[in-house]
């Protein structure tokens, strides 16, 4: 009895001990779990505080992207920094290029060549000498020199190294891309914004023109457009671009106005332009799209009215019709009330082209990729605002048809990489922009612009294979251009780091496919449409409005 009684307390003690130990273990486990939860919660809260809300928004790449049919190569180079005196000529400039002008943009073997990974190395010598070009094996890069004056080779080498990272190779990443955003689910309600939007203080932020990126924005309807009549501006406007004189019946495209994002653009007025350009000269140098911009500007200044007082001063700039030629190398007109001159010079490739044998009408022509047009070398000192462009004539059909032979350093090009048309074009753009930049210190009042590529809109083929652009509803409906950099990559890289400004019109023009001459051309062959040039009045007027705001 005593044994039983004595054992019972002991058992109970052991039992209580075990229960207490189990409770402690459970409490320790609960505390551990709470600590783990607390640590995780702390990490989550800390991460949330350090992460901006914008990180959870969809990236810009989710915006709708429109792929242009026109490819923009991106192999930048820069070279010639010679002074204009190196190439000066005392004789008047006469256009040596083929007189016929069309919208041809053959690509035949060009596209295959441009798919190669290209490498071109430009080695600048001392100022005043033509740079040499050599192929570098094993390196997929182009060394683009900064177009600035240098005293020592070491500084030049430093500049060359600095811009290496800006150079791209090949064509794969060079396709023209336009970033746009849907701004309204109802296209009509968006595009049919009234011109009251212009004066609404809440519609645009009032920031300075210098800070405005005019390439960003949207197209809206303005009841005050167009700025001139396409049927009345016959003094300046070629009939092949005056769609009012054709069989086209829809002209809603004439009423669209470009509205930059977050800033206002100064209204264009002919009288205001002439006052701003008093005793100055505006020069357009480029291809047929440059000529369209020139004719647009003349119509905008005059309001489409006949101006008998305007003087033809073409001979002052060497614009004479060569013997047997169809037209001069350009046109120049002067508004006497302000002594303002507006001119256009035909230079489809923006480089120097000269006959190899001046006595032979059938001779080949040297196409000097590293020399600016002879016109610029001779008349730059007379120009106050310069607008350059090139692009659509860089195809095998043009080169072969005009008997143009690529030259570098004064001799035929032997660099097979540079012979690819995409590389040759970009090489030339960088060369000419670099040369103009080197001239800016010599002409402090000169404002120079390079206009980006005007897009083509051929659908279902090319200009000679059934390509068309019959759309009459603009792609701009309900969309807004948002990209920061130009769709024309080559143009953007060419002007970077120079005093030459970019007149970026590619993206805003890309969403205006309805503005081309299309099938209504009065000179086109049956079945051939013009989806390269624009109806005037039209999109090129906006290019000039932006130019006016920038000068």
UniProtKB/Swiss-Prot annotation:
Motif segment (GDS motif): 286-288
UniProt keyword list: Membrane, Signal-anchor, Transmembrane, Transmembrane helix
Skewed-composition ranges (Basic and acidic residues): 95-107
InterPro entries xref list: TBL_C, TBL_N
Bilayer topology annotation: Single-pass type II membrane protein
Chain segments carrying region Disordered: 77-132
Misc note: Contains 2 motifs that are conserved in esterases, but it is unlikely that this protein belongs to the catalytically active pectin esterases.
Family the UniProt entry places it in: Belongs to the PC-esterase family. TBL subfamily.
Protein's name in the database: Protein trichome birefringence-like 16
Annotated organism of origin: Arabidopsis thaliana (Mouse-ear cress)
Name of the coding gene: TBL16
């Amino acid at each position: 009895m005593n044994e039983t009684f004595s054992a019972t307390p002991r058992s109970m003690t052991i039992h209580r001990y075990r229960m207490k130990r189990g409770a402690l273990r459970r409490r320790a486990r609960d505390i551990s779990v709470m600590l783990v939860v607390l640590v995780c919660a702390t990490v989550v809260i800390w991460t949330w505080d350090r992460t901006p809300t914008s990180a959870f928004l969809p990236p810009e790449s989710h915006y709708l992207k429109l792929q242009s049919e026109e490819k923009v190569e991106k192999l930048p180079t820069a070279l010639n920094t010679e002074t204009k005196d190196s190439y000066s000529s005392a004789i008047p400039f006469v256009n040596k290029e083929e007189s016929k002008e069309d919208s041809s943009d053959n690509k035949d073997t060009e596209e295959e060549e441009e798919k190669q990974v290209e490498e071109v190395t430009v080695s600048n010598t001392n100022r005043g000498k033509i740079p040499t070009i050599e192929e570098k094996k094993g390196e997929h890069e182009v060394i683009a020199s900064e177009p600035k004056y240098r005293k020592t080779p070491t500084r030049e080498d430093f500049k060359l190294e600095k811009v290496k990272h800006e150079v791209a190779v090949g064509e794969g990443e060079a396709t023209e891309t336009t970033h746009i955003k849907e701004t309204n689910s109802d296209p009509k309600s968006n595009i049919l914004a009234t011109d009251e939007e212009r004066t609404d203080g809440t519609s645009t932020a009032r920031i300075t023109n210098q800070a405005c990126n005019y390439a960003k924005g949207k197209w809206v309807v303005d009841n005050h457009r167009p700025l001139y009549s396409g049927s009345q501006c016959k003094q300046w406007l070629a009939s092949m671009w005056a769609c009012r004189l054709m069989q086209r019946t829809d002209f809603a495209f004439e009423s669209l106005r470009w509205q930059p994002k977050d800033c206002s653009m100064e209204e264009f007025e002919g009288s205001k332009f002439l006052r701003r350009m008093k005793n100055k000269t505006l020069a357009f140098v480029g291809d047929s799209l440059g000529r369209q911009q020139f004719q647009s500007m003349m119509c905008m200044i005059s309001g489409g009215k006949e101006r008998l007082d305007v003087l033809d001063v073409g001979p002052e700039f060497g614009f004479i019709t060569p013997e047997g030629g169809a037209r001069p190398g350009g046109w120049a007109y002067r508004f006497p009330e302000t002594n303002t001159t507006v001119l256009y010079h035909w230079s489809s490739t923006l480089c120097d082209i000269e006959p190899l044998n001046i006595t032979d009408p059938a001779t080949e022509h040297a196409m000097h990729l590293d020399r600016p047009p002879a016109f610029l070398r001779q008349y730059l000192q007379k120009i106050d605002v310069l607008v350059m462009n090139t692009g659509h004539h860089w195809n095998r059909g043009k080169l072969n048809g005009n008997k143009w032979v690529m030259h570098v350093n004064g001799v035929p090009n032997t660099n097979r990489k540079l012979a690819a048309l995409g590389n040759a074009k970009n090489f030339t753009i960088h060369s000419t922009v670099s040369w103009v930049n080197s001239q800016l210190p010599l002409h402090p009042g000169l404002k120079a612009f390079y206009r980006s590529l005007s897009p083509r809109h051929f659908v279902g083929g090319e200009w000679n294979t059934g390509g068309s652009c019959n759309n009459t509803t603009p792609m701009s409906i309900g969309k807004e251009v948002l990209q920061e950099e130009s769709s024309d990559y080559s143009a953007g890289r060419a002007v970077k780091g120079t005093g030459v400004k970019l007149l970026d019109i590619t993206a805003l023009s890309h969403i205006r496919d309805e503005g081309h001459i299309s099938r209504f051309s009065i000179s086109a062959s049956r079945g051939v449409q013009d989806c390269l040039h624009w109806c005037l009045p039209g999109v090129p007027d906006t290019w000039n409005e932006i130019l006016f705001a920038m000068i």
